[in-house]
């Protein structure tokens, strides 16, 4: 038979005849099972057209259902796909029976055809995929010898083939067939019901019966006689709808058929048989006409199909046996429908038509394709055989394809994926600290309920069985986790304080998440599915007991992040650096399983690729016990939940934490994960029809089960275990068993003896964990899969609940009173269902499938393996070692290869490390035990980061004649690199070097120098790339002699092709021009100076100076022999090197010219991408000029001074003592040189060793590198062998647990809320800060309310209060943004000062002319930042006063107003000097020409390109990028010319009108903030690392008013002060029309590290919440006090850091570079330091972070101690208050370890 290929363009044509027959009957077997299998096939990637057809058909049916009358529409249940309609057989007996019968028949036949067609031609699944990819091509059924036939509604299905030009067309046309069948059914029902209404009281009646053995003429005569006698109306007459030689079918209204059959002797004689036709009449010409047919097919979709398709394959009419004659798609549909409605079925005519066709075409055979063999097909085969001599007929059934099970399941997309559970962990009541202990508890049938333990609350005072005492529990029982406070805080980077304040359930959630991930073999970014951006966390939590009760007793720093639910999964995401979603879900009792369903949905939607999910519950709040008691939820009697017991009286509350890890199944399989269970489907619904919100509803539960089973594509009878919700309440248990039996053990369709169903409920063992209940049940089922057993149910203490069905045995449903085996069954899968219901009405159900078996006979070819153990603490390190040894003792047959894979590629690696290389398990145990013995002396890898790595490339002296490299044979990457290099070499005309490395020759076989040298360099290049692929990347390289070529390639100097060319060409020249063996090389174990002394007067050459005592000499053979004899005679060891030529000697001179010429021609030398240590030059090369053809010439001839090169590299810090050296070559030689030259070097390792298996050498080196802190890509190392390796379920991390627990004290939970104080008015007044105002006419945008004023003679005082949140004030502040927040610029202070100064003067000097004012000596100690909450006021208070106005001076102070309406300490001060502007103008005249001269000089510098000129937009863009983002009205500078710290600007003031001002702040700022621009934009300041702000000025005065729209020019030059290099001073001159009209004199700027910007400029939520302590002024430091960063033009005042107890001062003490870290020691170390500031500081740190002083070793980092940013601010404030040490929160970033901080404190504060 020809085979279709994509290239052929169409399916092959056949000479034989083909007939495709569509039946009119649905299969008699399990229809639901067939549709379920179709659904599963549609989820497979190999059947995209099947999925599309089902989708299109579903849409078509839904559209038709929408158009039904309301009453009929209500009969149709919600359906996910059209396939779901098979689940409702009762619908096929009602008004939609005909429609649904037709829909299901057409769907089944067309879907089967789509799935089966490729298998008519292809055996392999891959070929089927290829077929579908080319489905747009024509397929075989369109050959000219193909015909279609059908009976009844099957005739409609023929259109799906007849109209299609390609298989890809079938889904759309097939969906139209389904639509037409639905419409045909509704029409037939409507017409038929007009003849005889449906009898709904009993079983449906038939509309057709068959009369066997009768002749059509006799039947028609009898009917005619009866109709005449009965005077039957024409529409109601019984008629003949079909006949053949052996029978006649009559049709008509059911009651009339019954009457005829009862009264007619003729029909009684023929034993009439009723047909299952319940939906009305077809084949009735007297009832239907062409108009009916056109009504059925008149749809918009039909018009679209008619435009695209036309009939291509003939279809036989069932009445005449001739093909339909339609030429259009619409015409064919109309003829098909009309045939069904009006024409009788004469199958004999169809048979004759096929016979005639075969005869006419001289066909000798016919392939008949049928869905199932039936009587019409047998008639056809008989006729063909009898009427056509020698005619062969073959028949193939299509339905069996549906029943086939594929060996390969490929989901079509993520939505069709199964979900694999790959890791799990738990903490459960009864001491179940892991899943194994949990199983032991279940297996033993334990009930772990007990009295409420004392660490929760005092049960004696909080329990009242009578329920009379307020707020008490009615039960004293529960199921509890042992010691829920245990936690390894340092592991999770949490301080003891934070750990103590964090909810224990959230702590245990992150612990179990880690354990589940560890068991899942999770390593971040190891595979696409473990990409950190694609991992999410989902946890269910339904209570906040610990936050509400325990931590609420003394609210502190971590009350919110430690207790609020969102932080649980959020903390897991943060710790693991997952960037996917984190959800905390509360659906009451179903929280965890509903959350797991949400997690599955995330995977199905493709939102995530891996999820960590679970639930958590730790009970500490007596209120919940009381509330549930009063709600009648809880059992009052001892024991866990009495599930299914006659005396069940409520549930028993329980703790629990459970975590699982999930991926899509295909990802888990690709990632080589252990699959411990599979989720096939999950869903949630709500018991909306229940009698109350807390009451269950059997109907809702049953509906949910159907939905889940349908989505899973699983027959409910195939489910063998249901884990029920089973809380032990009378209502809940009885309702749930009703819904379970209805769906999973129905009485109508019973389970076979081979299909037992067991039920269980874990709450009988460990109680109801509420939010954790669902995942607890899920873990139980996963353990059942692992253990192949069902644990006993222990909830029935007395007898079974009488509300349970009495026929459980008949239903084959069993309660396991004892442990029951649950083995795997070959060829079948174990399915289980887990239920989890919510007290709030939600129902969640998950369908599980057993994990697949994995078998392999793979043998890892590697002879040695690496096993790693690590931990974050020494205690855990020892425990982890001990656990692994114990595991190996218990599992002596453990695969070493899989153990290595698990502990390297599938584990995180912490700083305490053990790494062993071994060839068997016994060796592993021995080496691990040696680690345990030395654990106290073990040192962790440094926390400073991985060490530098240097590659040393071996020269030819280390090479051996023929190698047999195991890496070449077993490492695909290494092998491919060598083969690529060999191809490059051969491409340049050199011989292959592979025979020198593949073991094809004996080891002593001598290859040519060309092959030998090419092999050496290529092996080194391949080795280097292999190391780099394993994550070992060099920071520097050095090559010895020939090894330099490989080094140059790795450093990027030479391409691989050029390196091989140079090596090969050099070897060729040596072969051509030098005699092999004429010269020798001699290695001497002696310093060069000693050799020179011993050989004085002897001829020799120095080839290599390898080390202090390692020298290589060269010369002619005779010379070398003489030299060797002399040196040996004086005691020096000499070794003759086995090399063909004497390199680096005069022998090579013959090739130098030719070699240099070759190197010049076509070889490209590039700049190195890393330092290259040159043994030729004895220096480190960084540039692209040094390594040239000349260099290569010199390197060939001149001495290799390896010693000098290494010493120089160390001198220039290219390498140091911490550098790790990797020798790249076939045998380690250079390592000895390195160790001799740099004796303190960290580690030296080899790549290969002569005579040692490559894998043994490599493993030993990998262990050394790993323990040195080099980050190895273990996954890359194991990847080539991964499919044969298994992830072992090794012991999880051994925690260094300590108890962190805040005990609930007393009984305040019982007595709360009984005393109230009516302080509403007082509180409101405090909150609004309102004070009685003094009548005053003064009100501006910044001076809003005068709250106090007094005038006594020449003395006076005015106090104003303003709300910064008022629109104009807030707008002014937001016009000057720093770090994204509005900051009050000093120009606003200026406006306030001038306003109050004028008001004070006018009230003290009546009628006098107001003088001009100079606002002098402004000092701002702390900045003023607009708060975030604009709905609450933010008040400031400013006071101006004078003791004598005649003195011409008034004093100003600024204060914040606190929540209690008191004023804080002053944060700013200034003076108003009353003066005469005329005097100012006169005094400025001498300065005018000087200023003008500097402006002109700047202009010239700008013209010469020396100074920078900025446009307005550019200037303010730079300003915004560096510090201040000004609003438009502040942007007065139109252009700026800047050179170093000098600048001038042309200014136009804004004309925008907003607010009421004395001098608008944006006017002052525009003319003065040039100084800020200079300090924050000039390249004379390191603006990247620093920013500058001003604490004030000496004077601010304007001789003329600033006018909107007017033009001005400002000039400033800032000068660095001598006494403090961080402070700059300057005068800003404001000019108009060439004259100075204003001045901001003595403006000061201070430079601050940019890292402090967030610290100083962050908007508080509510500024008034800052405490007095936080806002108080800074205590005087040891040096001259300096104001903190504040604002004036161009910047803003530094606010108090807005956090609890933030320090007021932010001026850092000097911060020199930290000294090298001392060796770890408990701090303080020195005896004399006990009273030092440093010692007190450490005590304070320990106290605040709840640490022991012994924890504060010098090498301990604050990050690892849990001192986060929040804690840093708290400690910084304590330093200021208690030690007088003013620091910032960033101090712990600048000095990251205890030792760094201690050294700084000792230096500056002792």
UniProtKB/Swiss-Prot annotation:
GO terms for biological process: arugosin biosynthetic process; emodin biosynthetic process; fatty acid biosynthetic process; monodictyphenone biosynthetic process; monodictyphenone metabolic process; o-orsellinic acid biosynthetic process; secondary metabolic process; secondary metabolite biosynthetic process. It catalyses: holo-[ACP] + 8 malonyl-CoA + 8 H(+) = atrochrysone carboxyl-[ACP] + 8 CO2 + 8 CoA + 2 H2O. Multidomain protein; including a starter unit:ACP transacylase (SAT) that selects the starter unit; a ketosynthase (KS) that catalyzes repeated decarboxylative condensation to elongate the polyketide backbone; a malonyl-CoA:ACP transacylase (MAT) that selects and transfers the extender unit malonyl-CoA; a product template (PT) domain that controls the immediate cyclization regioselectivity of the reactive polyketide backbone; and an acyl-carrier protein (ACP) that serves as the tether of the growing and completed polyketide via its phosphopantetheinyl arm. Residues 1344-1479 are annotated as: N-terminal hotdog fold. Residues 30-283 are annotated as: N-terminal acylcarrier protein transacylase domain (SAT). Residues 1506-1654 are annotated as: C-terminal hotdog fold. Disruption phenotype: Impairs the production of monodictyphenone and any of the intermediates of the pathway. Residues 1344-1654 form the PKS/mFAS DH domain. GO terms for molecular function: fatty acid synthase activity; phosphopantetheine binding. This is Atrochrysone carboxylic acid synthase. Its EC number is 2.3.1.-. The keyword Transcription regulation does not apply. Pfam families: Acyl_transf_1 (PF00698), CurL-like_PKS_C (PF22621), ketoacyl-synt (PF00109), Ketoacyl-synt_C (PF02801), PP-binding (PF00550), SAT (PF16073). The modification O-(pantetheine 4'-phosphoryl)serine is found at residue 1765. The gene is mdpG. Residues 1340-1659 are annotated as: Product template (PT) domain. Residues 951-1270 are annotated as: Malonyl-CoA:ACP transacylase (MAT) domain. Transmembrane segments: none annotated. It comes from Emericella nidulans (strain FGSC A4 / ATCC 38163 / CBS 112.46 / NRRL 194 / M139) (Aspergillus nidulans). The active site is at residues 589, 725, 768, 1376, 1565. NCBIfam families: PT_fungal_PKS (TIGR04532). Atrochrysone carboxylic acid synthase; part of the gene cluster that mediates the biosynthesis of monodictyphenone, a prenyl xanthone derivative. The pathway begins with the synthesis of atrochrysone thioester by the polyketide synthase (PKS) mdpG. The atrochrysone carboxyl ACP thioesterase mdpF then breaks the thioester bond and releases the atrochrysone carboxylic acid from mdpG. The atrochrysone carboxylic acid is then converted to atrochrysone which is further transformed into emodin anthrone. Residues 416-850 form the Ketosynthase family 3 (KS3) domain. Residues 1668-1726 are annotated as: Disordered. Pathway: Secondary metabolite biosynthesis. Residues 1709-1721 have a biased composition (Pro residues). Residues 1728-1805 form the Carrier domain. Keywords: Multifunctional enzyme, Phosphopantetheine, Phosphoprotein, Transferase.
């Amino acid at each position: 038979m020809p085979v279709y290929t994509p290239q052929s363009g169409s399916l092959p044509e056949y000479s034989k005849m083909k007939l495709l027959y569509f039946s009119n009957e649905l299969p008699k077997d399990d229809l639901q099972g067939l549709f379920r299998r179709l659904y599963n096939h549609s989820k497979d990637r190999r059947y995209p057209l099947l999925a599309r057809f089902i989708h299109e058909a579903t849409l078509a049916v839904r559209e038709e259902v929408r158009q039904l009358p309301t009453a009929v529409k209500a009969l149709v249940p919600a359906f996910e796909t059209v396939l779901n309609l098979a689940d409702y057989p009762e619908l096929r007996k009602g008004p939609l029976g005909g429609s649904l019968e037709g829909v299901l028949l057409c769907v089944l036949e067309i879907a089967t055809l789509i799935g089966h067609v490729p298998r008519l031609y292809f055996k392999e699944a891959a070929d089927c995929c290829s077929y579908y990819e080319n489905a747009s091509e024509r397929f075989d059924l369109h050959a000219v010898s193909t015909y279609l036939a059908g009976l009844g509604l099957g005739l409609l299905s023929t259109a799906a083939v007849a109209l299609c030009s390609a298989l890809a067309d079938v889904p759309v046309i097939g969906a139209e067939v389904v639509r037409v069948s639905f419409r045909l059914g509704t029409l037939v029902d409507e017409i038929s019901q007009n003849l005889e209404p449906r009898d709904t009281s009993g079983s449906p009646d038939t509309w057709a019966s068959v009369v066997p053995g009768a002749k059509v003429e006799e039947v028609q005569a009898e009917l005619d006689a009866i109709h005449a006698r009965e005077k039957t109306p024409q529409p109601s007459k019984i008629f003949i709808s079909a006949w053949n030689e052996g029978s006649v079918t009559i049709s008509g209204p059911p009651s009339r058929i019954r009457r005829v059959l009862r009264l007619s002797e003729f029909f009684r004689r023929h034993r009439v048989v009723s047909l299952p036709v319940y939906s009305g009449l077809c084949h009735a010409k007297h009832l239907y006409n062409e108009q009916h047919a056109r009504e059925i097919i008149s749809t918009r979709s039909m018009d679209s199909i008619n435009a695209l398709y036309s009939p291509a394959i003939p279809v036989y009419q069932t009445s005449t046996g001739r093909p339909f004659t339609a030429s259009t798609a619409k015409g064919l549909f109309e003829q098909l429908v009309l045939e069904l409605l009006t024409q009788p079925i004469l199958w004999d005519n169809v048979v004759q038509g096929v016979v005639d066709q075969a005869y006419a075409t001289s066909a000798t055979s016919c392939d008949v394709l049928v869905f199932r063999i039936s009587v019409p097909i047998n008639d056809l085969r008989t006729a063909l055989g009898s009427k056509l001599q020698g005619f062969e007929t073959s028949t193939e059934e299509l339905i069996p394809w549906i029943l086939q099970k594929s060996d390969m399941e490929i989901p079509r997309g993520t939505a069709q994926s199964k979900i694999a559970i790959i890791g799990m962990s738990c903490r459960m009541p009864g001491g179940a600290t892991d899943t194994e202990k949990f199983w032991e508890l279940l297996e033993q049938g334990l009930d772990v309920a007990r009295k409420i333990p004392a660490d929760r609350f005092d049960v004696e005072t909080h329990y009242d069985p009578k329920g009379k005492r307020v707020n008490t529990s009615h039960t004293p029982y529960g199921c509890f986790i042992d010691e829920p406070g245990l936690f390894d805080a340092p592991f999770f980077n949490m301080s003891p304080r934070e750990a103590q304040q964090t909810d224990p359930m959230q702590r245990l959630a992150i612990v179990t998440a880690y354990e589940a991930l560890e068991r899942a073999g999770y390593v971040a970014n190891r595979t696409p599915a473990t990409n950190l951006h694609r991992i999410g966390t989902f946890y269910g939590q339904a209570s906040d007991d610990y936050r509400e009760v325990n931590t609420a007793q003394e609210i502190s720093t971590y009350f919110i992040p430690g207790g609020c639910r969102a932080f649980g999964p959020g903390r897991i995401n943060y710790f693991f650096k997952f960037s996917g979603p984190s959800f905390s879900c509360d659906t009451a009792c179903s929280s965890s399983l509903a959350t797991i369903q949400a997690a599955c949905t995330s995977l199905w939607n493709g939102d995530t690729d891996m999820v960590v999910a679970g639930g958590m519950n730790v009970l500490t709040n007596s209120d919940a016990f009381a509330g549930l008691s009063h709600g009648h939820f809880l059992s009052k009697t001892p024991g866990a939940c009495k599930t299914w017991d006659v005396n069940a009286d409520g549930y028993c509350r329980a703790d629990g934490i459970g975590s699982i890890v999930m991926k899509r199944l295909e990802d888990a399989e690709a990632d080589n994960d252990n699959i411990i269970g599979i989720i096939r489907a999950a869903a949630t619904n709500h018991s909306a029809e229940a009698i109350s919100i807390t009451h269950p509803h059997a109907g809702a539960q049953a509906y949910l089960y159907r939905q889940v089973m349908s989505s899973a594509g699983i027959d409910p009878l195939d489910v063998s275990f249901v884990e029920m919700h089973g809380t032990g309440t009378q209502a809940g248990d009885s309702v749930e068993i009703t819904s379970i039996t209805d769906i999973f053990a129905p009485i109508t369709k019973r389970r076979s003896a081979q299909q037992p169903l067991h039920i269980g409920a874990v709450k009988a063992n460990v109680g109801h964990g509420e939010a954790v209940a669902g995942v607890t049940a899920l873990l139980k089922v996963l353990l059942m899969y692992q253990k192949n057993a069902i644990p006993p149910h222990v909830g029935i203490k007395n007898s079974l609940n009488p509300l349970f069905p009495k026929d459980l045995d008949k239903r084959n449903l069993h309660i396991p009173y004892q442990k029951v085996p649950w083995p795997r069954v070959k060829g079948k899968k174990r399915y289980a269902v887990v239920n989890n219901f919510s007290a709030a009405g939600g129902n969640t159900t998950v369908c599980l499938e057993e994990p697949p078996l994995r078998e392999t006979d793979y043998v890892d070819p590697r002879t040695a393996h690496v096993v790693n153990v690590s931990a974050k603490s020494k205690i855990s390190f020892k425990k982890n070692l001990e656990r692994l040894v114990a595991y190996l003792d218990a599992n002596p047959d453990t695969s070493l290869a899989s153990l290595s894979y698990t502990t390297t590629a599938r584990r995180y690696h912490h700083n305490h490390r053990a790494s062993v290389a071994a060839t068997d398990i016994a060796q592993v145990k021995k080496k691990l035990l040696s680690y345990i013995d030395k654990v106290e002396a073990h040192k962790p890898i440094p926390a400073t980061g991985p060490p530098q790595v240097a590659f040393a490339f071996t020269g030819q002296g280390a090479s051996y004649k023929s190698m047999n490299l195991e890496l070449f044979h077993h490492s695909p990457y290494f092998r491919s690199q060598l083969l690529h290099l060999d191809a490059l070499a051969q491409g340049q005309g050199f011989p292959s070097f592979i025979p020198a490395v593949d073991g094809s020759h004996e080891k002593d076989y001598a290859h040519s120098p060309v092959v030998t040298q090419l092999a050496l360099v290529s092996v080194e290049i391949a080795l280097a790339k292999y190391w780099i692929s394993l994550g070992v990347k060099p920071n520097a390289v050095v090559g010895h002699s020939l090894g330099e070529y490989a080094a140059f390639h790795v450093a990027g100097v030479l391409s691989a092709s050029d390196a091989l060319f140079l090596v090969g060409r050099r070897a060729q020249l040596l072969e051509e021009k030098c005699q092999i063996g004429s010269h020798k090389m001699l290695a001497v174990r002696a310093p060069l100076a000693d050799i020179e002394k011993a050989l004085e007067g002897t001829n020799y050459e120095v080839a290599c100076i390898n080390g202090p005592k390692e020298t290589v000499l060269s010369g002619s053979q005779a010379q070398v022999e003489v030299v060797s004899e002399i040196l040996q005679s004086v005691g020096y060891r000499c070794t003759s090197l086995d090399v063909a030529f004497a390199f680096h000697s005069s022998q090579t001179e013959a090739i130098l010219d030719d070699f240099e010429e070759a190197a010049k021609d076509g070889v490209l030398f590039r700049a190195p991408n890393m330092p290259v240590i040159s043994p030729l030059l004895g220096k480190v090369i960084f540039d692209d000029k040094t390594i040239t053809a000349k260099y290569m010439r010199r390197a060939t001839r001149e001495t290799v001074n390896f010693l000098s090169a290494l010493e120089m590299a160390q001198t220039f810090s290219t390498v140091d003592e911490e550098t790790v050296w990797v020798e790249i070559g076939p045998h380690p030689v250079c390592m000895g040189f390195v160790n001799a030259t740099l004796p303190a070097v960290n580690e030296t390792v080899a790549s290969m060793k002569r005579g040692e298996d490559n894998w043994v050498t490599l493993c030993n080196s990998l262990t050394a590198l790993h323990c040195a802190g080099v980050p190895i890509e273990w996954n890359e190392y194991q990847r080539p062998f991964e499919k044969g390796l298994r992830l072992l379920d090794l012991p999880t991390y051994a925690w260094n647990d300590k108890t962190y627990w805040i005990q609930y004290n007393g009984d305040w939970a019982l007595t709360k809320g009984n005393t109230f104080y009516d302080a509403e008015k007082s509180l409101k007044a405090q909150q609004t800060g309102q004070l009685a105002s003094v009548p005053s006419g003064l009100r501006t945008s910044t001076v809003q309310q005068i709250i106090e004023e007094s005038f006594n003679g020449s003395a006076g005082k005015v106090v104003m209060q303003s709300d910064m949140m008022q629109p104009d004030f807030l707008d002014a502040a937001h016009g000057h943004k720093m770090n994204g927040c509005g900051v009050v610029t000093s120009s606003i202070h200026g406006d306030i000062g001038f306003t109050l100064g004028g008001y004070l003067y006018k009230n003290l000097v009546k009628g006098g002319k107001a003088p001009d004012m100079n606002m002098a000596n402004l000092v701002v100690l702390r900045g003023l930042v607009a708060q975030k909450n604009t709905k609450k006021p933010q008040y400031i208070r400013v006071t101006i006063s004078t003791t004598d106005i005649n003195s011409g001076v008034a004093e100003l102070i600024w204060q914040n107003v606190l929540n209690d309406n008191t004023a804080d300490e002053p944060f700013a001060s200034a003076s108003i000097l009353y003066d005469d502007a005329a005097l100012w103008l006169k005094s400025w005249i001498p300065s005018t020409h000087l200023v003008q001269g500097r402006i002109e000089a700047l202009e010239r510098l700008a013209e010469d390109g020396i100074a920078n000129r900025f446009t307005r937009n550019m200037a303010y863009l730079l300003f915004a990028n560096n510090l201040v983002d000004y609003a438009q009205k502040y942007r007065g500078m139109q252009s700026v010319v800047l050179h170093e710290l000098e600048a001038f600007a042309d200014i136009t003031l804004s004309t925008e009108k907003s607010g009421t001002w004395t001098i608008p702040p944006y006017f002052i700022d525009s003319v003065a903030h040039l100084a800020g621009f200079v300090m924050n934009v000039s390249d004379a300041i390191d603006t990247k690392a620093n920013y500058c702000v001003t604490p004030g000025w000496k004077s601010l005065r304007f001789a003329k008013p600033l006018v909107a729209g007017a033009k001005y020019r400002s000039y400033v030059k800032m000068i660095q002060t001598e006494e403090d290099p961080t402070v700059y001073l300057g005068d800003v001159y404001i000019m108009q029309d060439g004259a100075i009209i204003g001045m901001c004199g003595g403006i000061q700027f201070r430079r601050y590290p940019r890292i402090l910007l967030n610290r100083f400029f962050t908007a508080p939520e509510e500024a008034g919440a800052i405490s007095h302590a936080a806002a108080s002024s800074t205590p005087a430091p040891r040096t001259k006090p300096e104001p903190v960063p504040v604002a004036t033009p161009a910047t803003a005042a530094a606010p108090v850091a807005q956090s609890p107890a933030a320090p007021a001062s932010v001026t850092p003490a000097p911060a020199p570079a930290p000294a090298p870290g001392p060796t770890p020691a408990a701090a303080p170390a020195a005896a004399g330091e006990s009273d030092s500031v440093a010692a007190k500081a450490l005590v304070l740190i320990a106290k605040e972070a709840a640490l022991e002083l012994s924890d504060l070793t010098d090498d301990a980092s604050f990050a690892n101690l849990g001192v986060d940013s929040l804690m840093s601010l708290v400690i910084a404030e304590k330093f200021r208050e208690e030690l007088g040490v003013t620091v910032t929160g960033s101090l712990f970033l600048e000095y990251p370890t205890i030792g760094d901080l201690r050294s700084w404190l000792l230096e500056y504060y002792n």
